[in-house]
Swiss-Prot record:
This is Thymidylate kinase. One of its GO terms (cellular component) is cytosol. NCBIfam families: DTMP_kinase. Keywords: ATP-binding, Kinase, Nucleotide biosynthesis, Nucleotide-binding, Transferase. ATP binds at G7, V8, D9, G10, V11, G12, K13, S14. PROSITE patterns: THYMIDYLATE_KINASE. GO terms for molecular function: ATP binding; dTMP kinase activity. Pfam families: Thymidylate_kin. Phosphorylation of dTMP to form dTDP in both de novo and salvage pathways of dTTP synthesis. It comes from Helicobacter pylori (strain HPAG1). It catalyses: dTMP + ATP = dTDP + ADP. Belongs to the thymidylate kinase family. It is an enzyme of class 2 (transferase). Its EC number is 2.7.4.9. The gene is tmk.
Length: 191
């Protein structure tokens, strides 16, 4: 089963992934972008080079295609639990050029069975961002991240409606333990 954790920077995805690693020891944990050796190179270029937004979108789509082919599909064939920090949902939300059609091509229509979406309000996001050193995306401000969050929600629910992906939307400001229990129960519902 393919499960993805989604949410804007600062909502606690990495914390939850760490807890899930302790709970689901036999699961394959991966990430997008950069879940393969080639993906790390593409991610580095996309985030650090002065390139057009369109070129950046295609680098991320290339990463997604390689990740699907070399990581996701083999693990699904082995019937493994796959837990990914981000997915095509982030790809569509963060890019102005990344459409569902292009992402379905890149993923060969391999979609997550379950989507966990961590959401946060403006004040909570401001507080979380004030506690960390900010990257290029986080430096664009809370309004930009809240716009991306709305796109994440829209894309996740569109995948639910069109393809039957299950979506669990959680308030990221709940306690780490409460969130972990809800996420683990959602995953275990089928495992």
């Amino acid at each position: 089963m393919y499960v993805v954790l989604e949410g804007v920077d600062g909502v606690g995805k990495s914390t939850q992934v760490g807890l899930l690693k302790d709970r689901f020891k036999n699961a394959l944990f991966t990430k997008e972008p950069g879940g393969t050796k080639m993906g790390e190179s593409l991610r580095h270029i996309a985030l650090n080079e002065n390139i057009s937004e369109l070129a950046r979108a295609f680098l991320f789509l290339s990463d997604r295609a390689e990740h699907t082919e070399s990581v996701i599909k083999p693990a699904l064939k082995e019937k493994r639990l796959i837990i990914s920090d981000r997915s095509l949902i982030s790809g569509m939300a963060y890019s102005e050029f990344s459409s569902l059609e292009l992402n379905l091509l890149a993923t060969q229509s391999v979609l997550p069975a379950k989507i966990i979406l961590l959401v946060i309000d403006k004040e909570g996001l401001k507080q979380r961002l004030s506690l960390k050193s900010l990257d290029k995306i986080e430096n664009q401000g809370t309004e930009k991240l809240l716009t991306i969050q709305q796109k994440l929600k829209t894309h996740a629910h569109a995948l639910q409606e069109k393809f039957g992906c299950e979506v669990l939307e959680l308030d990221a400001q709940k306690s780490v333990g409460d969130l972990h229990r809800q996420i683990a129960a959602f995953i275990e519902c089928v495992v």
